[in-house]
Regions:
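N-terminal nicking endonuclease/strand-transfer module with a His-rich metal-binding environment
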Residues: 1-125
Length: 128
């Protein structure tokens, strides 16, 4: 069974912090499985996720304070779940954030498979 946790940035969030976390979570060597990158953008594009989040923030005049939420869904070491199934479970969980921009990146480089969710703080509209 997966567990969910949220990452707290004790020194606060900056645009530099957000950009660094996005780069970390999308690393090819962490998200690759059988030639496929387990990276999905919901209401945003992975290739331009930083610009997408910042455009939304500027539009709503919310460019300071909490910039994003960072959630992690982890499966225990030895859990019989493959990376594709873990990513599908992560995408199903991300549907609960309908109307938000969400980046989902499933990491396969550890003994425990886990997915990172970077969620833009601002609700924009429901997905089509």
């Amino acid at each position: 069974m997966a567990i969910i946790s949220f990452t707290n940035y004790k020194r606060g969030q900056t645009t530099g912090c957000m950009s660094a976390v996005m780069r970390y979570t999308m690393q090819d060597k962490k998200t690759e499985f059988e030639g496929q990158q387990l990276v999905t953008g919901i209401n945003c594009q992975p290739e331009s996720v930083y610009a997408d989040f910042m455009t939304t923030k500027r539009l709503y005049h919310k460019t300071d304070g909490v910039l994003f939420y960072h959630m992690v869904q982890s499966f225990p070491k030895g859990e019989a779940v493959d990376p594709v199934t873990a990513h599908a479970a992560a995408l199903k969980l991300a549907k609960y954030y309908e109307g938000y921009e969400v980046l989902v990146c499933t990491h396969t480089d550890r003994e425990h498979i886990h997915s990172h969710f970077l969620i833009c703080l601002l609700y924009t509209s429901p997905s089509p």
